[in-house]
Swiss-Prot record:
GO biological process: one example: mitochondrion organization
Subunit structure: Heterotrimer composed of a catalytic subunit and a homodimer of accessory subunits (POLG:POLG2).
Keyword Transit peptide appears in the UniProt entry: yes
Species: Mus musculus (Mouse)
GO terms under cellular component: gamma DNA polymerase complex; mitochondrial matrix; mitochondrial nucleoid; mitochondrion
Superkingdom as given in the UniProt entry: Eukaryota
Gene name for this UniProt entry: Polg2
Main localization (coarse): mitochondrion
Record-given protein name: DNA polymerase subunit gamma-2
Recorded coiled-coil stretches: none
Molecular function, one GO term: double-stranded DNA binding
Amino acid sequence: MRCGGGARACRRACRCWLSGYAGPADGTQQPDAPEHAVAREALVDLCRRRHFFSGTPQQLSTAALLSGCHARFGPLGVELRKNLASQWWSSMVVFREQVFAVDSLHQEPGSSQPRDSAFRLVSPESIREILQDREPSKEQLVAFLENLLKTSGKLRATLLHGALEHYVNCLDLVNRKLPFGLAQIGVCFHPVSNSNQTPSSVTRVGEKTEASLVWFTPTRTSSQWLDFWLRHRLLWWRKFAMSPSNFSSADCQDELGRKGSKLYYSFPWGKEPIETLWNLGDQELLHTYPGNVSTIQGRDGRKNVVPCVLSVSGDVDLGTLAYLYDSFQLAENSFARKKSLQRKVLKLHPCLAPIKVALDVGKGPTVELRQVCQGLLNELLENGISVWPGYSETVHSSLEQLHSKYDEMSVLFSVLVTETTLENGLIQLRSRDTTMKEMMHISKLRDFLVKYLASASNV
Protein backbone atom coordinates (compact mmCIF):
# COMPACT_ATOMS: atom_id res chain seq x y z
CA MET A 1 0.00 0.00 0.00
CA ARG A 2 1.47 3.35 -1.05
CA CYS A 3 1.55 6.28 1.32
CA GLY A 4 -1.37 8.70 0.99
CA GLY A 5 -1.58 12.49 1.37
CA GLY A 6 -1.38 12.33 5.17
CA ALA A 7 1.77 10.21 5.08
CA ARG A 8 3.39 12.50 2.50
CA ALA A 9 2.62 15.54 4.66
CA CYS A 10 4.10 13.78 7.66
CA ARG A 11 7.25 12.92 5.73
CA ARG A 12 7.59 16.53 4.53
CA ALA A 13 7.29 17.78 8.10
CA CYS A 14 9.96 15.35 9.28
CA ARG A 15 12.35 16.32 6.49
CA CYS A 16 11.74 20.02 7.15
CA TRP A 17 12.54 19.47 10.80
CA LEU A 18 15.68 17.49 10.01
CA SER A 19 16.92 20.20 7.65
CA GLY A 20 17.01 22.66 10.54
CA TYR A 21 14.25 24.98 9.31
CA ALA A 22 13.20 27.36 12.07
CA GLY A 23 10.92 29.81 10.31
CA PRO A 24 11.39 33.54 9.95
CA ALA A 25 13.79 35.03 12.46
CA ASP A 26 11.76 38.05 13.41
CA GLY A 27 8.56 36.52 14.71
CA THR A 28 5.14 37.96 13.95
CA GLN A 29 3.88 41.12 15.55
CA GLN A 30 1.39 43.88 15.13
CA PRO A 31 2.88 47.24 14.10
CA ASP A 32 3.74 49.56 16.97
CA ALA A 33 1.18 52.25 17.75
CA PRO A 34 2.42 55.79 16.94
CA GLU A 35 2.22 56.97 20.54
CA HIS A 36 4.87 54.56 21.78
CA ALA A 37 6.83 53.69 18.63
CA VAL A 38 9.37 56.52 19.05
CA ALA A 39 10.08 55.75 22.71
CA ARG A 40 10.32 52.02 21.98
CA GLU A 41 12.77 52.57 19.12
CA ALA A 42 14.88 54.85 21.33
CA LEU A 43 15.00 52.25 24.11
CA VAL A 44 15.79 49.32 21.80
CA ASP A 45 18.51 51.37 20.10
CA LEU A 46 20.03 52.26 23.47
CA CYS A 47 19.86 48.66 24.69
CA ARG A 48 21.57 47.43 21.52
CA ARG A 49 24.36 50.02 21.68
CA ARG A 50 24.97 49.43 25.38
CA HIS A 51 24.72 45.63 25.11
CA PHE A 52 21.60 45.06 27.16
CA PHE A 53 20.11 43.46 24.05
CA SER A 54 21.79 41.25 21.49
CA GLY A 55 20.52 40.67 17.98
CA THR A 56 19.38 42.27 14.76
CA PRO A 57 16.54 44.83 14.64
CA GLN A 58 14.23 42.08 13.35
CA GLN A 59 15.10 39.85 16.30
CA LEU A 60 14.34 42.72 18.68
CA SER A 61 10.80 43.37 17.50
CA THR A 62 8.14 43.39 20.21
CA ALA A 63 6.85 39.92 19.30
CA ALA A 64 10.37 38.48 19.05
CA LEU A 65 11.35 39.90 22.46
CA LEU A 66 8.29 38.29 24.03
CA SER A 67 8.64 34.95 22.23
CA GLY A 68 11.93 33.83 23.76
CA CYS A 69 13.17 32.37 20.47
CA HIS A 70 16.41 34.35 20.43
CA ALA A 71 19.27 35.15 22.78
CA ARG A 72 17.74 38.52 23.61
CA PHE A 73 20.15 39.72 26.24
CA GLY A 74 23.70 40.95 25.83
CA PRO A 75 26.30 41.03 28.66
CA LEU A 76 24.67 43.90 30.57
CA GLY A 77 21.21 42.41 30.09
CA VAL A 78 22.39 39.07 31.43
CA GLU A 79 23.86 40.82 34.47
CA LEU A 80 20.60 42.70 35.02
CA ARG A 81 18.64 39.45 34.82
CA LYS A 82 21.07 37.81 37.23
CA ASN A 83 20.62 40.64 39.73
CA LEU A 84 16.83 40.37 39.43
CA ALA A 85 16.95 36.61 40.01
CA SER A 86 19.27 37.15 42.98
CA GLN A 87 16.81 39.60 44.55
CA TRP A 88 13.99 37.11 44.01
CA TRP A 89 16.03 34.35 45.63
CA SER A 90 16.86 36.50 48.65
CA SER A 91 13.24 37.52 49.09
CA MET A 92 11.70 34.07 48.62
CA VAL A 93 14.33 31.66 49.95
CA VAL A 94 17.27 33.11 51.87
CA PHE A 95 15.25 34.98 54.47
CA ARG A 96 12.48 32.39 54.88
CA GLU A 97 12.94 29.44 57.20
CA GLN A 98 10.11 27.43 55.60
CA VAL A 99 11.33 27.56 51.99
CA PHE A 100 13.92 25.15 50.59
CA ALA A 101 15.86 25.12 47.34
CA VAL A 102 15.37 22.24 44.90
CA ASP A 103 16.55 21.39 41.41
CA SER A 104 15.12 19.32 38.57
CA LEU A 105 16.06 18.13 35.10
CA HIS A 106 15.21 20.07 31.94
CA GLN A 107 13.96 16.75 30.56
CA GLU A 108 10.93 14.98 31.98
CA PRO A 109 9.68 11.45 31.28
CA GLY A 110 7.42 11.13 28.24
CA SER A 111 3.65 11.04 28.64
CA SER A 112 1.09 8.79 27.02
CA GLN A 113 -1.61 11.44 27.23
CA PRO A 114 -2.86 12.13 23.68
CA ARG A 115 -3.25 15.88 24.18
CA ASP A 116 0.10 16.47 25.80
CA SER A 117 1.68 19.17 23.61
CA ALA A 118 5.07 19.42 25.35
CA PHE A 119 8.16 19.37 23.16
CA ARG A 120 9.79 15.96 22.80
CA LEU A 121 13.49 15.14 22.65
CA VAL A 122 13.82 12.96 19.57
CA SER A 123 16.99 11.77 17.87
CA PRO A 124 17.16 12.62 14.14
CA GLU A 125 18.33 9.06 13.50
CA SER A 126 15.00 7.76 14.80
CA ILE A 127 13.17 9.83 12.18
CA ARG A 128 15.57 8.89 9.37
CA GLU A 129 14.98 5.24 10.16
CA ILE A 130 11.37 5.41 9.00
CA LEU A 131 12.11 7.85 6.17
CA GLN A 132 14.50 5.36 4.61
CA ASP A 133 11.45 3.27 3.78
CA ARG A 134 10.23 5.02 0.64
CA GLU A 135 6.75 3.57 0.77
CA PRO A 136 5.52 3.42 4.37
CA SER A 137 1.78 3.30 4.85
CA LYS A 138 -0.06 5.95 6.80
CA GLU A 139 -0.77 3.41 9.53
CA GLN A 140 2.93 2.56 9.82
CA LEU A 141 3.87 6.23 10.11
CA VAL A 142 1.23 6.93 12.74
CA ALA A 143 2.16 3.88 14.81
CA PHE A 144 5.87 4.69 14.60
CA LEU A 145 5.42 8.34 15.60
CA GLU A 146 3.01 7.57 18.44
CA ASN A 147 5.44 5.06 19.91
CA LEU A 148 8.29 7.53 19.48
CA LEU A 149 6.37 10.24 21.35
CA LYS A 150 5.48 7.87 24.18
CA THR A 151 9.04 6.70 24.74
CA SER A 152 10.92 9.98 24.24
CA GLY A 153 11.49 12.53 26.98
CA LYS A 154 9.94 15.97 26.91
CA LEU A 155 11.22 19.45 27.68
CA ARG A 156 9.70 20.95 30.80
CA ALA A 157 7.17 23.73 30.31
CA THR A 158 7.09 24.64 33.99
CA LEU A 159 9.05 24.01 37.19
CA LEU A 160 5.96 22.85 39.07
CA HIS A 161 6.27 19.12 38.41
CA GLY A 162 9.95 19.09 39.32
CA ALA A 163 9.08 20.55 42.73
CA LEU A 164 6.27 18.04 43.25
CA GLU A 165 8.74 15.20 42.73
CA HIS A 166 10.75 16.53 45.69
CA TYR A 167 7.69 16.85 47.93
CA VAL A 168 7.84 13.55 49.83
CA ASN A 169 11.55 13.82 50.66
CA CYS A 170 11.16 17.43 51.81
CA LEU A 171 8.06 16.50 53.82
CA ASP A 172 10.32 14.23 55.85
CA LEU A 173 12.85 17.09 56.17
CA VAL A 174 10.29 19.30 57.96
CA ASN A 175 8.98 16.40 60.06
CA ARG A 176 5.75 16.50 58.02
CA LYS A 177 4.82 19.92 59.40
CA LEU A 178 2.82 22.26 57.14
CA PRO A 179 3.14 24.77 55.57
CA PHE A 180 6.44 24.85 53.68
CA GLY A 181 7.67 25.73 50.21
CA LEU A 182 10.08 24.58 47.49
CA ALA A 183 11.81 27.14 45.28
CA GLN A 184 13.72 26.91 42.02
CA ILE A 185 14.94 29.13 39.18
CA GLY A 186 15.45 27.52 35.78
CA VAL A 187 14.80 27.58 32.04
CA CYS A 188 11.45 26.35 30.72
CA PHE A 189 10.28 25.81 27.15
CA HIS A 190 7.12 26.71 25.26
CA PRO A 191 5.83 26.54 21.67
CA VAL A 192 5.93 29.72 19.59
CA SER A 193 3.42 29.95 16.76
CA ASN A 194 4.13 31.88 13.57
CA SER A 195 1.56 32.95 11.01
CA ASN A 196 4.27 32.98 8.33
CA GLN A 197 5.13 29.35 9.02
CA THR A 198 5.30 26.93 6.10
CA PRO A 199 2.50 24.36 5.52
CA SER A 200 4.57 21.83 7.44
CA SER A 201 3.57 23.67 10.62
CA VAL A 202 6.99 23.36 12.21
CA THR A 203 6.76 25.09 15.58
CA ARG A 204 9.70 26.89 17.10
CA VAL A 205 10.84 26.48 20.69
CA GLY A 206 10.74 29.50 22.97
CA GLU A 207 12.65 29.71 26.24
CA LYS A 208 12.10 31.64 29.44
CA THR A 209 13.78 31.80 32.82
CA GLU A 210 11.17 30.95 35.43
CA ALA A 211 11.34 31.69 39.15
CA SER A 212 9.03 29.29 40.96
CA LEU A 213 7.76 28.83 44.49
CA VAL A 214 5.50 25.85 45.21
CA TRP A 215 3.81 26.30 48.57
CA PHE A 216 2.21 23.38 50.43
CA THR A 217 -0.43 24.43 52.94
CA PRO A 218 -3.50 22.97 54.66
CA THR A 219 -6.65 23.59 52.64
CA ARG A 220 -8.26 25.60 55.43
CA THR A 221 -5.55 28.31 55.15
CA SER A 222 -4.91 28.13 51.40
CA SER A 223 -6.94 31.26 50.57
CA GLN A 224 -5.14 33.33 53.20
CA TRP A 225 -1.76 32.16 51.93
CA LEU A 226 -2.69 32.95 48.33
CA ASP A 227 -3.64 36.48 49.40
CA PHE A 228 -0.39 36.78 51.35
CA TRP A 229 1.79 35.78 48.42
CA LEU A 230 -0.16 38.04 46.06
CA ARG A 231 0.43 41.08 48.26
CA HIS A 232 4.06 40.15 48.81
CA ARG A 233 4.82 39.63 45.15
CA LEU A 234 3.11 42.83 43.99
CA LEU A 235 4.99 44.89 46.58
CA TRP A 236 8.23 43.17 45.58
CA TRP A 237 7.87 44.10 41.90
CA ARG A 238 6.94 47.67 42.81
CA LYS A 239 9.90 47.99 45.15
CA PHE A 240 12.40 48.26 42.28
CA ALA A 241 10.25 50.38 39.95
CA MET A 242 10.44 54.04 38.99
CA SER A 243 6.68 53.93 38.29
CA PRO A 244 5.21 51.35 40.72
CA SER A 245 1.68 51.87 39.41
CA ASN A 246 2.68 50.16 36.14
CA PHE A 247 2.63 46.89 38.09
CA SER A 248 -0.89 45.64 38.79
CA SER A 249 -2.83 42.46 39.59
CA ALA A 250 -6.05 40.82 38.47
CA ASP A 251 -7.94 37.66 39.42
CA CYS A 252 -8.09 34.80 36.92
CA GLN A 253 -9.45 31.29 36.53
CA ASP A 254 -8.29 28.36 34.41
CA GLU A 255 -10.33 25.92 32.33
CA LEU A 256 -10.65 23.59 35.34
CA GLY A 257 -12.17 26.32 37.48
CA ARG A 258 -9.10 26.79 39.66
CA LYS A 259 -8.70 30.32 40.93
CA GLY A 260 -5.60 32.46 40.87
CA SER A 261 -4.16 35.89 40.19
CA LYS A 262 -1.86 37.40 37.61
CA LEU A 263 0.61 40.24 38.03
CA TYR A 264 1.00 42.51 35.02
CA TYR A 265 3.36 45.17 33.79
CA SER A 266 1.92 47.91 31.57
CA PHE A 267 4.20 48.04 28.54
CA PRO A 268 3.62 50.77 25.93
CA TRP A 269 1.75 48.24 23.75
CA GLY A 270 -0.37 46.88 26.61
CA LYS A 271 -0.25 44.72 29.72
CA GLU A 272 1.80 41.52 29.83
CA PRO A 273 1.66 38.94 32.66
CA ILE A 274 4.99 38.69 34.48
CA GLU A 275 3.90 36.40 37.31
CA THR A 276 1.04 33.98 37.95
CA LEU A 277 -0.30 32.60 41.22
CA TRP A 278 -2.59 29.55 41.31
CA ASN A 279 -4.45 27.60 43.96
CA LEU A 280 -4.13 24.11 42.47
CA GLY A 281 -5.86 22.21 45.27
CA ASP A 282 -4.66 18.71 46.18
CA GLN A 283 -5.16 17.03 42.78
CA GLU A 284 -1.62 17.74 41.55
CA LEU A 285 -0.14 15.84 44.50
CA LEU A 286 -2.64 13.00 44.23
CA HIS A 287 -1.84 12.63 40.54
CA THR A 288 1.93 12.70 41.16
CA TYR A 289 1.73 10.18 44.02
CA PRO A 290 -1.11 7.72 43.25
CA GLY A 291 -1.78 4.98 45.75
CA ASN A 292 -1.18 5.30 49.49
CA VAL A 293 -2.44 8.75 50.52
CA SER A 294 -0.71 8.57 53.90
CA THR A 295 2.70 9.04 52.24
CA ILE A 296 1.80 12.58 51.16
CA GLN A 297 -0.11 13.69 54.24
CA GLY A 298 1.36 16.48 56.32
CA ARG A 299 0.61 17.66 59.84
CA ASP A 300 -1.86 20.50 60.40
CA GLY A 301 -1.82 20.73 64.16
CA ARG A 302 -2.94 17.28 65.27
CA LYS A 303 -4.55 16.37 61.97
CA ASN A 304 -2.96 14.58 59.02
CA VAL A 305 -4.08 16.18 55.75
CA VAL A 306 -3.20 16.16 52.06
CA PRO A 307 -1.95 19.71 51.51
CA CYS A 308 -3.20 22.21 49.00
CA VAL A 309 -0.63 23.28 46.37
CA LEU A 310 -0.09 26.97 45.64
CA SER A 311 2.04 27.84 42.61
CA VAL A 312 3.85 31.18 42.33
CA SER A 313 5.75 31.40 39.03
CA GLY A 314 7.39 34.50 37.58
CA ASP A 315 8.96 35.18 34.19
CA VAL A 316 12.42 36.58 34.98
CA ASP A 317 13.12 37.43 31.32
CA LEU A 318 9.92 39.43 30.94
CA GLY A 319 10.55 41.04 34.32
CA THR A 320 13.97 42.16 33.10
CA LEU A 321 12.35 43.66 30.01
CA ALA A 322 9.77 45.40 32.20
CA TYR A 323 12.43 47.11 34.32
CA LEU A 324 14.28 48.29 31.22
CA TYR A 325 11.09 50.00 30.01
CA ASP A 326 10.32 51.28 33.51
CA SER A 327 13.76 52.83 34.03
CA PHE A 328 14.15 54.47 30.61
CA GLN A 329 13.94 58.26 30.71
CA LEU A 330 14.39 61.05 28.20
CA ALA A 331 15.49 64.29 29.87
CA GLU A 332 16.85 67.64 28.79
CA ASN A 333 20.59 67.63 28.21
CA SER A 334 22.03 70.84 29.62
CA PHE A 335 25.39 70.13 27.98
CA ALA A 336 24.06 69.54 24.46
CA ARG A 337 24.56 72.31 21.93
CA LYS A 338 21.30 71.44 20.21
CA LYS A 339 18.18 71.77 22.33
CA SER A 340 16.58 68.95 20.35
CA LEU A 341 19.07 66.45 21.77
CA GLN A 342 17.82 64.69 24.88
CA ARG A 343 19.69 62.96 27.67
CA LYS A 344 18.89 59.25 27.65
CA VAL A 345 19.28 57.44 30.93
CA LEU A 346 18.38 54.07 32.40
CA LYS A 347 17.55 54.68 36.05
CA LEU A 348 17.59 51.08 37.15
CA HIS A 349 17.23 50.44 40.86
CA PRO A 350 20.66 50.32 42.57
CA CYS A 351 20.16 46.64 43.43
CA LEU A 352 19.46 45.78 39.79
CA ALA A 353 21.96 48.02 37.98
CA PRO A 354 24.53 45.77 36.24
CA ILE A 355 27.43 48.11 36.99
CA LYS A 356 27.61 50.15 40.18
CA VAL A 357 30.62 52.36 39.50
CA ALA A 358 32.89 53.34 36.60
CA LEU A 359 36.53 54.34 37.05
CA ASP A 360 38.22 56.84 34.73
CA VAL A 361 41.41 58.89 34.70
CA GLY A 362 41.77 62.61 34.05
CA LYS A 363 44.78 64.85 33.69
CA GLY A 364 48.02 63.62 35.18
CA PRO A 365 50.66 60.91 34.79
CA THR A 366 48.82 58.08 33.05
CA VAL A 367 50.78 55.15 34.50
CA GLU A 368 50.40 56.28 38.11
CA LEU A 369 46.71 57.13 37.70
CA ARG A 370 45.95 53.74 36.19
CA GLN A 371 47.74 52.03 39.06
CA VAL A 372 45.50 53.90 41.49
CA CYS A 373 42.42 52.86 39.51
CA GLN A 374 43.54 49.24 39.43
CA GLY A 375 43.98 49.17 43.20
CA LEU A 376 40.59 50.81 43.68
CA LEU A 377 38.97 48.33 41.29
CA ASN A 378 40.38 45.36 43.20
CA GLU A 379 39.16 46.79 46.50
CA LEU A 380 35.62 47.33 45.22
CA LEU A 381 35.42 43.92 43.54
CA GLU A 382 36.48 42.25 46.78
CA ASN A 383 33.45 43.88 48.41
CA GLY A 384 31.05 42.62 45.76
CA ILE A 385 30.70 45.95 43.93
CA SER A 386 30.69 45.64 40.14
CA VAL A 387 33.07 48.06 38.38
CA TRP A 388 33.51 49.29 34.82
CA PRO A 389 37.27 49.83 34.07
CA GLY A 390 36.90 52.94 31.93
CA TYR A 391 40.53 53.83 32.57
CA SER A 392 41.68 50.90 30.42
CA GLU A 393 39.95 52.13 27.25
CA THR A 394 42.29 53.33 24.51
CA VAL A 395 39.83 55.62 22.68
CA HIS A 396 39.76 59.09 24.19
CA SER A 397 36.36 60.50 25.12
CA SER A 398 35.35 63.77 26.74
CA LEU A 399 33.79 63.75 30.21
CA GLU A 400 30.45 64.70 28.66
CA GLN A 401 30.62 61.68 26.35
CA LEU A 402 31.61 59.39 29.22
CA HIS A 403 28.76 60.60 31.42
CA SER A 404 26.28 60.11 28.58
CA LYS A 405 27.60 56.59 28.00
CA TYR A 406 27.46 55.65 31.67
CA ASP A 407 23.93 57.06 32.07
CA GLU A 408 22.80 54.81 29.22
CA MET A 409 24.58 51.86 30.84
CA SER A 410 22.77 52.70 34.11
CA VAL A 411 26.07 53.08 36.01
CA LEU A 412 25.22 54.51 39.44
CA PHE A 413 28.42 56.48 40.01
CA SER A 414 31.41 57.49 37.94
CA VAL A 415 34.74 58.20 39.61
CA LEU A 416 37.42 60.42 38.11
CA VAL A 417 40.99 59.94 39.32
CA THR A 418 43.30 62.85 38.50
CA GLU A 419 46.63 64.30 39.50
CA THR A 420 44.81 65.83 42.46
CA THR A 421 44.23 62.31 43.71
CA LEU A 422 47.98 61.70 43.72
CA GLU A 423 48.53 64.92 45.68
CA ASN A 424 45.84 64.76 48.37
CA GLY A 425 43.74 61.61 47.73
CA LEU A 426 40.63 63.42 46.45
CA ILE A 427 38.52 61.92 43.67
CA GLN A 428 35.55 63.32 41.77
CA LEU A 429 32.30 61.39 42.23
CA ARG A 430 29.33 61.91 39.89
CA SER A 431 25.83 60.54 40.52
CA ARG A 432 23.73 59.09 37.71
CA ASP A 433 20.44 60.17 39.29
CA THR A 434 21.32 63.75 40.25
CA THR A 435 24.21 64.41 37.79
CA MET A 436 25.82 66.26 40.71
CA LYS A 437 29.57 66.04 41.24
CA GLU A 438 31.38 66.09 44.56
CA MET A 439 34.88 65.61 45.86
CA MET A 440 35.54 62.66 48.15
CA HIS A 441 38.65 61.15 49.66
CA ILE A 442 39.53 57.88 47.96
CA SER A 443 39.68 56.04 51.29
CA LYS A 444 35.97 56.74 51.89
CA LEU A 445 34.66 55.52 48.54
CA ARG A 446 34.27 51.84 49.45
CA ASP A 447 32.34 52.50 52.66
CA PHE A 448 30.16 55.07 50.89
CA LEU A 449 29.18 52.61 48.15
CA VAL A 450 28.60 49.73 50.58
CA LYS A 451 26.28 51.87 52.73
CA TYR A 452 24.50 53.29 49.68
CA LEU A 453 23.73 49.86 48.24
CA ALA A 454 22.72 48.47 51.64
CA SER A 455 20.27 51.31 52.24
CA ALA A 456 18.84 50.93 48.72
CA SER A 457 18.14 47.23 49.32
CA ASN A 458 16.32 47.98 52.58
CA VAL A 459 13.91 50.55 51.15
